[in-house]
Amino acid sequence: MSQQHTLPVTLPPALSQELLDTVPPPVNTQQEQRKQPAALPPPCQEVPVELPVEGPSKHEEKHMTIVKGAPEQECEQQQQPQEQKLQQQHWEQDEEHQKAENPEQQLKQEKAQREKQQLQGQLEEEKKLLDQQPDHELAKSDEQLGTKKEQLLEFPEQQEGQLKCLEQQEGHLELPEQQEGQLKCLEQQEGHQELPEQQEGQLKHLEQQEGQLKHLEQQEGQVKHLEQQEKQSELPEQQRGQPKYLEQQEGQLKHLEEQKGQLKHLEHQEGQLELPEQVGQPKHLEQLEKQLEHPEQQEGQLKQLEEQEGQVKHLEQQEEQLKHLEQQEGQPKHPEQLEKQLEHPEQQEGQLKQLEEQEGQVKHLEQQEEQLKHLEQQEGQPKHLEQLEKQLEHLEQQEGQLKHLEQREEQLELPEQQVGQSKHLEQEEKQLEHPEQQEGQLKHLGKQEAQLELPEQVGQPKHLEQQEKQLEHPEQQEGQLKPQEQQEGQLKGLEQQERQLEQPVFAPAPGQVQGIQQALPPKGEVLLPVEQQQQKQEVQWQHK
């Protein structure tokens, strides 16, 4: 009976064996799929996956033992739920693994799952139909089932190909999990690479700063040159044409204040650039830092410039006074103006004080020379030293000029070198013929003496030429010395004579003028009262 029962079942066991032989490959393919992710970066390997590998072997043993005397339907019914469970487990695991990988893969997997579910539904319907069909139709249905199962088996192979393609795409697209790990690595690498990049940027910035500091050094040289020019402008010979130049200097001072703000900004930037051991930093930066450590010196220089501006304004006032004196010289000298000038001896005293202040300025120039020497020691720059040497030579020339001017002032104070002596003497001889004009002449002489005490009046070149001509003729000078000494005596007694001019004055003859002048006491003698002098003059006229 067993043989008769087994004879019709010979074909189905072959099919069942084929099914049993074909079922395990999905497990192997899925194992291969799980082995492939091992090639992925470390973040992708963290997903733990455990596969029930021993399951298929047990099922195979059971099916092999049951096939001996079991019908075809029982084998198929036992195999189908087990296969479905295994496939569902694998699908769920694949879904979980793929969800962690990429959302695009999830969509593709969902489509594949839908197709599988449709195929499974079709298989179940066909199996139900097979249960109802007779045995002769089982062969055809088994063939159809085999083809469909082959399709099912081929489907995971397609999935493997798709997974490989996706893995290749992932190698280009970098999954977010891989990206996190790679970003960390990149951040570490960038942390090492950012230093040279930052250093390069800093070097460029430092080069720009060097250019700015060189420009500032040039401007400092210009400022020093301006200081020299301002010092030169303190000299009375260089008082003209300064107002426009002063406006330029004020603009330059404003520009210097802006540069001070830039220097402070650069110091702030250097404080921020505290990276250790910058690559290839020039040695020039150390020198620049040392220079920036002394902003107080720059402030002191600016204060000196401001003080010099005040001095320049004072010089402008002196220029206006000189212009006023020029206008007065060009106008005819009336006795009323002369009286007003004699009434203000305080102005003359103020002018003498100005001369003393100028001498103090010369001393200040010497102090500034010492400061320049000190700056030379601090800076130690050859180009700047050459400029300073030129400046010192120029200052020495200026000192020589000042000494020469002082000598000229001393010469002008001497009575032997009075300005326009010959012309004034002729005018005085003509005016002495008229006793009414003696008062105006005396006042005029007082004004001349006051003007001779002023420093460097306009028109000195003409007077100097006259003096040179006079020096060429010493005989004339000897003849002129006597009346000059007499004029000095007259000037000293002007104030006393003005008070006593109410007494009558006798008009001398034209030839008697020189006798009157000789009657006056020479330089250094004591003057007698006005009445005694007049009596002497009357006696001399009577004798003549």
Curated annotation (Swiss-Prot):
Gene Ontology biological process terms from the UniProt entry: keratinization; keratinocyte differentiation; peptide cross-linking; response to UV-B
Principal localisation: cytoplasm
Pfam families assigned: Involucrin (PF00904), Involucrin_N (PF10583)
Keywords: Cytoplasm, Keratinization, Repeat
Gene Ontology cellular component annotations, sorted alphabetically: cornified envelope; cytoplasm
Expression across tissues: Keratinocytes of epidermis and other stratified squamous epithelia.
Domain of life: Eukaryota
Region (Disordered): 1-520
Basic and acidic residues bias locations: 96-117, 124-152, 202-234, 252-271, 283-297, 304-347, 354-411, 423-437, 462-476
Compositional bias (Low complexity): 76-90, 477-494
Subcellular location, record wording: Cytoplasm
PTM comment: Substrate of transglutaminase. Specific glutamines or lysines are cross-linked to keratins, desmoplakin and to inter involucrin molecules.
UniProt subunit comment: Directly or indirectly cross-linked to cornifelin (CNFN).
Function: Part of the insoluble cornified cell envelope (CE) of stratified squamous epithelia.
Family designation: Belongs to the involucrin family.
Name this protein carries in UniProt: Involucrin
Top-level taxonomy: Eukaryota, Metazoa, Chordata, Craniata, Vertebrata
